[in-house]
Regions:
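Short aromatic-glycine-(Arg/Gly/Cys) micro-motifs in beta-strand/loop hairpins
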Residues: 335-357
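C-terminal target-recognition/interaction regions appended to catalytic cores
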Residues: 216-333
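Short, mixed-charge low-complexity intrinsically disordered segments
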Residues: 373-405
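Class I S-adenosyl-L-methionine
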Residues: 30, 48-52, 68-76, 86-252, ...
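A short, exposed loop/beta-hairpin motif centered on an aromatic-Gly-Thr core
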Residues: 352-369
Length: 405
């Protein structure tokens, strides 16, 4: 099957979403009323149920992305991807590209190279920036810019940028296929958090008894009873002890918070100590009340919430993307040449933000090196070991690198 041309559906920018999960990224984009998801890919069977419950009109492709031909994906304006975070996160044991799930980025890149969307959007765990001494993100960054994308990235916390009481830091990568929109785009500014825990957690309701911790029900109940004593805070059972989150927000939700009694957020309520309900964990990610949770085991719903995104942060970034597309939507993508090397400019702003793009393409390393002498002597040419040292020391620097294609 060949591409379906569906640019600008009903004057809205179209989206193809990969590793779609339960649809948090497209939900945030669609809340702006400027975007419409027309294709999504998700292989997890339980996530598929939740996705289709809430997005019945979207063509959900349930195959493994490795089985999807790039030519089968509709031609869209934006390709989004939140490839499995376990391959990069501390919680996923720091496996990185040694884990086969890390290879899924290259499957996403395969689709991007074929479809050439105007915008790419990636969300992942904060640790992706520093994983493997910085090499993991270096590969991702260089792969995107070598294929003609001008990218900016920044680590944002949901409580600071989404007005959501959850401590959730994630890296957001936005890429454009032309420099004009890239230059105009900025990440949103921080906002005051006015949403309180009581807005997402019902401390007065009587929930199903299965959510409560009772004497004789859990072998560690005495530790919980002693530690969990205050309203308006969230605790976390950490296998052997209780950790109190004193910042007035929910600790970072994880995919395993519903299994094994570990990483479970706990609250002190009118009716006793209990864990958050699945609905409350989705609330903590900024999902609206009308978002439907299907009849699935709670363990699946907890996993889906823990793997998902902070919807209001996605929406705020999407608003800025929409703004630059409306003002600078020009079709002058970089001409990707049949060359062997790319001369790449990077502005590394510590480990938490930056931007990068390809200056030009060359047939040999020597040509790229000679070109740098002609175009810019302010910023040095650095090599992999020097880059790793910058990441290790969390330093900021503007520099060039030569990437073999």
């Amino acid at each position: 099957m060949l591409h379906t041309e569906i640019y600008g559906l009903n004057n809205k920018h179209t989206i193809a979403s990969f590793f779609a999960g339960v649809g948090g990224i497209e939900l945030g984009f669609e809340q702006t009323n400027d975007f419409k998801a027309v294709y999504a890919n998700e292989v997890d069977k339980n996530a598929q149920i939740t996705y289709q419950t809430n997005f019945p009109e979207i063509n959900l492709d349930i195959r493994d992305i490795k089985e999807v031909e790039a030519t089968e994906v509709p031609k869209v304006d934006i390709v989004t991807g939140g490839f499995p975070c376990q391959a990069f996160s501390i919680a996923g044991y720091r496996k990185g590209f040694e884990d086969e799930r890390g290879d899924l980025f290259f499957e996403l890149l395969r689709v991007i190279k074929e479809n050439r969307p105007k915008v790419i959007f990636i969300e992942n765990v904060k640790n992706m920036v520093t994983h493997d001494k910085g090499n993991t993100f270096k590969v991702i960054r260089e792969s995107l810019v070598a294929n003609g994308y001008y990218i900016k990235w920044k680590v944002l916390n949901g409580k600071d940028y989404g007005n959501i009481p959850q401590n959730r830091e994630r890296i957001y990568v936005v890429g454009f296929n032309n420099k004009e929109t890239y230059d105009a785009f900025e990440f949103p500014e921080p906002v005051e958090m006015t949403t309180e825990l009581s807005d997402i957690i019902d401390y007065n309701s009587q929930e199903d008894e299965k959510y409560y911790y009772r004497e004789g029900k859990q072998p560690f109940y005495d530790k919980i009873e002693e530690a969990v004593i205050s309203y308006d805070t969230v605790y976390q059972w950490r296998r052997q002890y209780v950790r109190e989150n004193k910042s007035g927000v929910v600790p970072t939700l994880t995919a395993n918070m519903g299994t094994g009694g570990h990483n479970v957020p706990l609250v002190y309520t009118k009716n006793g100590v209990r864990k958050l309900t699945p609905r409350e964990t989705f609330n903590a990610q900024g999902y609206p009340e009308e978002y439907k949770l299907p009849e699935l085991a709670n363990s699946h719903l907890y996993k889906q919430a823990g793997n998902s995104v902070v919807v209001p942060v996605i929406k705020r970034i999407a608003e800025n993307i929409s703004d630059v597309l409306s003002k600078h939507d020009v079709d002058d993508a970089m001409n990707i040449q049949d060359a062997n090397y790319a001369l790449v400019y990077t502005d590394l702003q510590g480990n938490y933000a930056g931007e990068s793009y390809t200056h030009d393409y060359y047939n040999s390393y020597e040509e790229a090196e000679a070109a740098l002498d002609q175009i810019d002597d302010r910023f040095p040419l650095i090599h992999d070991t020097e880059y790793m040292e910058l990441v290790r020391k969390r330093k900021s620097m503007k520099f060039y690198s030569i990437v073999q294609l």
